[in-house]
Amino acid sequence: MKKALYLGAVAFSVAFSMASANEPKIDFNPPNYVEETPSKEFIPELNKLGSLFGQGERPLFADRRAMKPNDLITIIVSEKASANYSSSKDYKSASGGNSTPPRLTYNGLDERKKKEAEYLDDKNNYNFTKSSNNTNFKGGGSQKKSEDLEIVLSARIIKVLENGNYFIYGNKEVLVDGEKQILKVSGVIRPYDIERNNTIQSKFLADAKIEYTNLGHLSDSNKKKFAADAMETQMPY
């Protein structure tokens, strides 16, 4: 009894682990080239007499766009994705036939050898008929999907690369009536693509990673239970 319970617990644990491993995930660590590229060195500029652009914390005239590490920038996420896929397969095969062994004939005058040849020919006088085999397979499938995502969030400049590009990362969490919404964005942007109001469209993000997740009872009701998912994954048919 204990052994059966132990085996059941092990099977349950394996099924849970395999079901969890099948969930898609995104790694938000910076790409390798971002880690390998040196950071840009910022050389402090001296105040210029008569210049309208001051060097203080809040000068009267200044570029309000994000420029340095830890500066904030607003990302306008506008992503649309659609896919239409169909496939079909039809396979047929058949096999069958007969096999006849060669005949043995003696054309000489020796009666003994003639009888031996007739005896051997009689023993070898068989036909082999191969059984017929027919195989048919037909399958197909289609998929159509469309998704729209429109969200605005703020991100922080993590690193300014040597060529002036920024690696940014943003995280936003909203909890409404027990439902938690999590949005994560990361990518590399060019300073020239930042608007004057310090916003940038998500289409300008290179190596973009965008993750939108819902957590709560409502979102759980739209997902398969891990046990059912694990069983369907391991079923051979």
Curated annotation (Swiss-Prot):
InterPro entries: Flag_Lring (IPR000527). GO terms for cellular component: bacterial-type flagellum basal body, distal rod, L ring; cell outer membrane. It is found in: Cell outer membrane; Bacterial flagellum basal body. Its main location: membrane. Keywords: Bacterial flagellum, Cell outer membrane, Membrane, Signal. Residues 1-21 form the signal peptide. One of its GO terms (molecular function) is cytoskeletal motor activity. GO terms for biological process: bacterial-type flagellum-dependent cell motility. Residues 87-111 are annotated as: Disordered. HAMAP family: FlgH (MF_00415). Assembles around the rod to form the L-ring and probably protects the motor/basal body from shearing forces during rotation. Belongs to the FlgH family. The basal body constitutes a major portion of the flagellar organelle and consists of four rings (L,P,S, and M) mounted on a central rod. This is Flagellar L-ring protein. It comes from Helicobacter pylori (strain ATCC 700392 / 26695) (Campylobacter pylori).
